[in-house]
């Protein structure tokens, strides 16, 4: 299990939203590159980055900040928000990004996702953002009629490296992960699932390490880390102990 610290970018700054609302953004750091380096120094293995402005605009809007992050950390970075074309994907991977996250385009043009997986094997994830059980698109601004599992199953066998599942109704309010919907998704597909939205405490980390959650690749934490509700040392120690137990 991997704990992914999150950097959400708005106007070149690290922010966290409440319930996906761009008007409810709290600035946590004005230097995203320094934040990325700090997460690496704390012992995290990956970094999850979202270009919030890009998600709404449909193209990269915080490119300079993302490039600074890539230069500042040796950790692999996954990026979502505004990545809509094969050219976008190729350009970011060429700059050192480990994995792109395709969200809106996965709904609008699933064939592009399949082609991206063929062209860039191991480097493409799908982001599924849900509100009321339905998939949301365009930076969470629009709701679709598509169900979460219905969308995920479209990519079985395509080579998608992970599904990042965000419960918008839990995001940024420290309400705890929606375990029912998250585990239902993980049980419905063979693609590894990463939980996002609501991770609130060490109890949530412990819950992820229980046997029925083993299908999860990991979880993303934002506000709980920034607010000090999750101690990185304790969380990473729990994960390390769990891995040791699995390999013993």
Swiss-Prot record:
SUPFAM superfamilies tied to this protein: Ribulose-phoshate binding barrel
Known pathway: Amino-acid biosynthesis; L-histidine biosynthesis; L-histidine from 5-phospho-alpha-D-ribose 1-diphosphate: step 4/9
Subcellular localization(s) per the UniProt record: Cytoplasm
One function term, GO molecular function aspect: 1-(5-phosphoribosyl)-5-[(5-phosphoribosylamino)methylideneamino]imidazole-4-carboxamide isomerase activity
Active site per database record: 8 (proton acceptor), 129 (proton donor)
GO BP: L-histidine biosynthetic process; L-tryptophan biosynthetic process
Catalytic activity: 1-(5-phospho-beta-D-ribosyl)-5-[(5-phospho-beta-D-ribosylamino)methylideneamino]imidazole-4-carboxamide = 5-[(5-phospho-1-deoxy-D-ribulos-1-ylimino)methylamino]-1-(5-phospho-beta-D-ribosyl)imidazole-4-carboxamide
A GO CC term attached to the entry: cytoplasm
EC number: 5.3.1.16
UniProt keyword terms in alphabetical order: Amino-acid biosynthesis, Cytoplasm, Histidine biosynthesis, Isomerase
Cystines in this chain: none
Pfam family, one: His_biosynth
Family: Belongs to the HisA/HisF family.
Protein's UniProt name: 1-(5-phosphoribosyl)-5-[(5-phosphoribosylamino)methylideneamino] imidazole-4-carboxamide isomerase
Lineage per the UniProt record: Bacteria, Pseudomonadati, Pseudomonadota, Alphaproteobacteria, Hyphomicrobiales
